[in-house]
């Protein structure tokens, strides 16, 4: 009792807490970090690379990978394999090979069978078959880095690339050499026949793909869904829609007979048939197959299928049907952004309504192209959209509206290709407006005779005040505030290039490092008309004139005697209104 009371006097009494909120106090010690906790999570980087690969933004991938190397010091094989796949997908096999060698060299992160399969596929796509076979030989002989095993997956990657390129000769050679790895119980597998069928279709020999079916049946190989899809595609390429529908019906009958859902037609099957009926302009069959696709519970109609239906409707001349399907796409895309249409679908709709002269519909599609479409809108798509808007206004009889659109096109794009539908619409508009409202008024060279030699109107070369190429830009910078382009000469006085104002970006650099070389040269006997055409076609700011005997076409060894500038050309122009 005395001992207990002594201890109790040393302990400071604590305030009582309610029993429901009592929490025992416990001292916390920092936990020692385990090796697993120190691991770097690179999954977000891999997902980012996969996303950029789909967008074909290889430059952005390289930048982010280099930044990750500086941050983490070392990446793993999974990340670098995704980078290799990005290089192959974007068609840059040289960059893929360089990264592969960095991975395989001593001190690198190493390579595996996936790395080799990706490189083999890339070499096949680039048609560098000899290098691919050399790599396969090193794997076969066991001298390859990482000591991968020769497997069917490596062969299939190269085989698929060869078949996609239509190189069936080398594909058959690959099968003959490595048939032991690819044979299934002594006979070719269904996968091999599917690949060969696809190769024959890609090489414009669809009938040969259909003939392979008989060989499969003789070997007692049962066709799968991919086989039937390839056969249907081959029949459509041959223009035999009846045979395509026969395979389609056989496919459904076998699926019901064997209770095999993997034999049921999928969205690829229906999309292939839709394209076939669209090419054949068979609207009734197209509507039937589209209705069947919508009623099929196991088929999810994706953006590709919807786009194919709209294009097929337009080919059949049913703009109302195409508009209904297009509206359904927009309605479904509100709940599922994956279904948002691509820009080229908007262009297809705009082309159809522009021909009909439905300016209101084309304008609505034009305004919704930017906010409602999915993916990037390229410069070519923007130009065509502007041209279609002008064409629709012209076909609708709204000449003033079409003229305003044409003015905006000229201000924005500076040029109109005459071979396009927009160029033809501009020509029609110019014809209807005449000289009174034309924005493309001709300018005549009334002050000179185009057949005369350029020597008669050129500026003497000394008058252009050329600069020595060894001078630094900071010593002559004020010269480019007054002139857009200046000739550059060497120590012997020969013109070696032209320095433009927009290329002057380093004050401490010599002029020769920034000039454009060689300069465009013409002889003194070249006609004025030919030089004018050259300046306008290539948008040149200056042309160097050399003696006929010294002309070599490059300007490096030619003694310049004169120059002709764009400013001179503008002074020679005279508007047609002054001549009327």
Swiss-Prot record:
<keyword id="KW-0677">Repeat</keyword>
<protein>
    <recommendedName>
        <fullName>Pentatricopeptide repeat-containing protein At5g10690</fullName>
    </recommendedName>
</protein>
<dbReference type="Pfam" id="PF13041">
    <property type="entry name" value="PPR_2"/>
</dbReference>
<feature type="domain" description="CBS">
    <location>
        <begin position="486"/>
        <end position="553"/>
    </location>
</feature>
<feature type="repeat" description="PPR 5">
    <location>
        <begin position="224"/>
        <end position="254"/>
    </location>
</feature>
<dbReference type="GO" id="GO:0003729">
    <property type="term" value="F:mRNA binding"/>
</dbReference>
<comment type="similarity">
    <text>Belongs to the PPR family. P subfamily.</text>
</comment>
<feature type="repeat" description="PPR 9">
    <location>
        <begin position="382"/>
        <end position="417"/>
    </location>
</feature>
<feature type="repeat" description="PPR 6">
    <location>
        <begin position="266"/>
        <end position="296"/>
    </location>
</feature>
<feature type="repeat" description="PPR 2">
    <location>
        <begin position="112"/>
        <end position="142"/>
    </location>
</feature>
<dbReference type="Pfam" id="PF01535">
    <property type="entry name" value="PPR"/>
</dbReference>
<dbReference type="InterPro" id="IPR011990">
    <property type="entry name" value="TPR-like_helical_dom_sf"/>
</dbReference>
<dbReference type="InterPro" id="IPR046342">
    <property type="entry name" value="CBS_dom_sf"/>
</dbReference>
<dbReference type="InterPro" id="IPR000644">
    <property type="entry name" value="CBS_dom"/>
</dbReference>
<feature type="repeat" description="PPR 8">
    <location>
        <begin position="342"/>
        <end position="376"/>
    </location>
</feature>
<keyword id="KW-0129">CBS domain</keyword>
<feature type="repeat" description="PPR 4">
    <location>
        <begin position="189"/>
        <end position="223"/>
    </location>
</feature>
<feature type="repeat" description="PPR 7">
    <location>
        <begin position="302"/>
        <end position="337"/>
    </location>
</feature>
<feature type="repeat" description="PPR 3">
    <location>
        <begin position="151"/>
        <end position="181"/>
    </location>
</feature>
<dbReference type="InterPro" id="IPR044781">
    <property type="entry name" value="At5g10690-like"/>
</dbReference>
<feature type="repeat" description="PPR 1">
    <location>
        <begin position="76"/>
        <end position="110"/>
    </location>
</feature>
<dbReference type="InterPro" id="IPR002885">
    <property type="entry name" value="Pentatricopeptide_rpt"/>
</dbReference>
């Amino acid at each position: 009792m005395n001992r207990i009371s002594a201890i109790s006097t040393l302990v400071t009494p604590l305030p009582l807490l309610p029993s429901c909120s009592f929490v025992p106090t416990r001292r916390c010690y920092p936990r020692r970090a385990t090796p697993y906790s120190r691991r770097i999570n690179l999954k977000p980087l891999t997902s980012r690379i996969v996303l950029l690969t789909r967008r074909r933004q290889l430059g952005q991938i390289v930048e982010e990978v280099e930044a990750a190397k500086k941050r983490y010091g070392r990446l793993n094989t999974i990340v670098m394999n995704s980078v290799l796949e990005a290089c192959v997908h974007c068609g840059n096999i040289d960059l893929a090979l360089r990264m592969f060698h960095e991975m395989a060299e001593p001190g690198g992160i190493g390579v595996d069978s996936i790395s080799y399969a990706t490189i083999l596929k890339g070499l096949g796509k680039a048609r560098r078959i000899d290098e691919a076979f050399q790599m396969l030989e090193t794997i076969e002989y066991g001298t390859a880095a990482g000591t991968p095993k020769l497997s069917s997956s490596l062969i299939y990657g190269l085989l698929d690339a060869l078949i996609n390129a239509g190189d069936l000769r080398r594909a058959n050679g690959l099968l003959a050499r490595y048939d032991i790895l690819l044979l299934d119980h002594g006979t070719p597998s269904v996968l091999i026949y599917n690949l060969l069928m696809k190769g024959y279709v890609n090489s414009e020999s669809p009938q040969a793909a259909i003939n392979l079916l008989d060989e499969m049946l003789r070997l007692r190989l049962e066709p799968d869904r991919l086989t039937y899809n390839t056969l249907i595609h081959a029949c459509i390429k041959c223009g035999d829609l009846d045979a395509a529908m026969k395979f389609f019906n056989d496919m459904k009958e076998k699926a019901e007979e064997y209770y095999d859902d993997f034999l049921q037609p999928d969205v690829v099957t229906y999309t292939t048939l839709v394209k076939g009926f669209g090419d054949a302009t068979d609207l009734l069959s197209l509507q039937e197959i589209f209705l069947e696709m919508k009623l099929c519970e196991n088929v999810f109609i994706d953006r590709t299928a919807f786009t194919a239906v709209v294009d097929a409707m337009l080919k059949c001349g049913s703009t109302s049907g195409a508009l209904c399907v297009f509206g359904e796409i927009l309605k479904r895309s509100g709940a599922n952004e994956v279904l948002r249409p691509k820009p080229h679908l908007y262009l297809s709709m705009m082309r159809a309504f522009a021909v009909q002269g439905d300016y209101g519909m084309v304008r609505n599609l034009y305004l919704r192209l930017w906010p409602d479409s999915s993916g990037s809108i390229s410069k070519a798509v923007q130009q065509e959209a502007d041209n279609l808007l002008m064409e629709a206004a012209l076909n609708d009889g709204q000449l003033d509206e079409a003229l305003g659109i044409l003015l905006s096109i000229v201000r924005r794009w500076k040029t109109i290709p005459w071979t396009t539908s927009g160029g033809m619409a501009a020509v029609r508009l110019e014809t209807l407006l005449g000289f009174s409202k034309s924005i493309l008024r001709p300018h005549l060279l009334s002050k000179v005779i185009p057949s005369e030699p350029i020597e008669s109107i050129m500026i003497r070369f000394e008058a252009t005040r050329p600069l020595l190429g060894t001078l630094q830009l900071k010593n002559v910078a004020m010269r480019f505030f007054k002139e857009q382009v200046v000739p550059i000469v060497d120590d012997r006085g020969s013109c070696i290039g032209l320095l433009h104002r927009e290329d002057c970006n380093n004050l401490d650099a010599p002029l020769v490092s920034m000039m454009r070389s060689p300069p465009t040269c013409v002889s003194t006997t070249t006609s004025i008309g030919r030089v004018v055409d050259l300046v306008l076609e290539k948008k040149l700011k200056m042309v160097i004139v050399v003696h006929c005997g010294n002309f070599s076409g490059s300007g490096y060894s030619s003694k310049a005697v004169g120059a002709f500038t764009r400013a001179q050309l503008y002074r020679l122009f005279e508007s047609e209104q002054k001549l009327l």
